[in-house]
Every structure is written in structure tokens, then in C-alpha cells.
Amino acid sequence: MRQLCLSTALLFLLVILVDSTPLNIYHIQDEGLETSHRRGPEKRSVIDVVSGIINGVATGTKIIEKGAGILTGLAEIITKAIKGQVMISRIQFDNHTLEELPTLQLEYSTLSEENNGLKTSHRRGLEKRSVTDVVTSIINGVATGTKIIEKGAGILTGLAEIITKAIKGQVMISGIQFDNHTLEEYQTLKIEYSTLSEENKASKPALCLEPKVTGDCNATMTRYFYNTQTGLCEQFVYTGCEGNGNNFENLEDCMKTCSQEAGSL
């Protein structure tokens, strides 16, 4: 759960999703969120976030019902704000959507005050973890301006519905304690996630799926490669020989070639 929260925080810290700890939500056909950072534009997949949340639920977490409602609200805002693929930002939100986002943030703040943290069971012992740690990083990412596809919003909605059905007040969520119908729905959600992940990979050019190769020479060149694990174009040092097609001179070329838009051309 700690890894999940760290991941989501990196994500926008939203997507938010954004550095070495994968938040595990997608690429390509749902390919990620485009966010502006001082160091330049980056890609982060909505799947990275969803995956992290799903993994946390699978492990078994205590989460409060109001937190599930906030996830649902976030998914609704995303769904309203986009048709196909549209940049979500304070500037580009429809007015009614823009008004709803501050409301969602206010609800989050209230929940943050009310919730002193959720108890989760780990091998190392009992510890406190607040569901709002996860929710706030997602909200912050949306507020910053993210690109996310409708199918990704649907997965968030499905996750929130599962949480809502599985808990009343505070209940431990786990494979053992799920009601049968909830457990079945959870498995369906995981299958949808896996399918979307595979579709996403298939839609990318083959060179984007090649591993990073630094080479064995003595030069020092800054290059970029598409990381299939994180869904990001990431910087690496190329030594000037060997290598493969997943080797771009600049971030923009990497994103254009291996982004979801490129895969759909």
C-alpha cells in the first residue's frame, strides 16, 4: 500500500503518475496522461494508477465508503470532460466540469480531516494508511491537466463500484472477504485491465517494445527510450554503438513515435 501511495504521488505529483515507482495505469489506447513539468512534457498512463489501486485492493485494504464515492466522482468528471481523447485542464474543462472539480477537492479536504488513516495488515505489522493519500494524488493530477481516455475512466468507475459494494462503513477488502458477486466483478475488472494493457502494447510500433540498449562504447549521449513497464518515454545514456530502434534523440520524437496517437495513425 505504501508503494501504491508513493507511486500515485509521483504521478503528480497524475498521473500523476511520476517517476520510478510505477503507479500502474496505461499506455497507448488508453495511453496515459500528458503533463507539463519543468523538466518537459512526460507521458503517464492511466493504467499505472488503476493497476496500483487494484493491486492494493487485491492485497487487502481497509477503505471507507466516502473514499469510494470520491473515486466515482473523479471518474464522472473525467467522463464528462472528455469525448474520445481531450486534454483535461483548468483551461479546457467545460464550465460545469470546472465547477465540479473544486467541489471534489473540497470533499477530499473534508475527508482528509475526518480520516486519520485506515488500518492495513502487513507482514511487518499493523500500520495506518489513509485512502486520501491515493485520492489526492489522482485529484492533483487531474487539476494539473492530464490526458486520459474514456475507457480508463470506466475502469476507475468500476473500481469505485466494487469498493462501494464490498464495504459498509469500514470493512477489510480481500479475496477472502469479498462477497461472491463482488469477487467475480473484481476478477472481471482485472481481466479488463489486462486486456486493455495488451491492446495498448499491440497498438504501438514494434520498436517501442524493444528493450533499452546503452551499448558498450565510450561516448556519452543523452537519448530517450519508451519504457513499456511505466508507459513513459525516459532518458538514458547511450554510449554510441549497438543499440536498437527504441533510441530517440529527443523526448518529442519518442512520444510521437510511441504514444497512443502514433499507434492509431
Curated annotation (Swiss-Prot):
The record marks N218, A219 as: Reactive bond homolog. It is found in: Secreted. InterPro entries: Kunitz_BPTI, Kunitz_BPTI_sf, Prtase_inh_Kunz-CS, TFPI/VKTCI-like. Expressed only in the trophectoderm, which forms the outer epithelial layer of the trophoblast. The keyword Repeat applies. It comes from the Eukaryota. Glycans are attached at N95, N180, N218. One of its GO terms (cellular component) is extracellular space. Its main location: secreted. Keywords: Disulfide bond, Glycoprotein, Repeat, Secreted, Signal. Sequence repeats lie at residues 32-115, 117-200. Residues 208-258 form the BPTI/Kunitz inhibitor domain. Residues 1-20 form the signal peptide. GO terms for molecular function: serine-type endopeptidase inhibitor activity. Coiled coil: none annotated. SMART domains: KU (SM00131). May play a role in mediating maternal-conceptus interactions in the immediate preimplantation period. Does not seem to have proteinase inhibitory activity. This is Trophoblast Kunitz domain protein 1. The lineage of its organism: Eukaryota, Metazoa, Chordata, Craniata, Vertebrata. The gene is TKDP1.
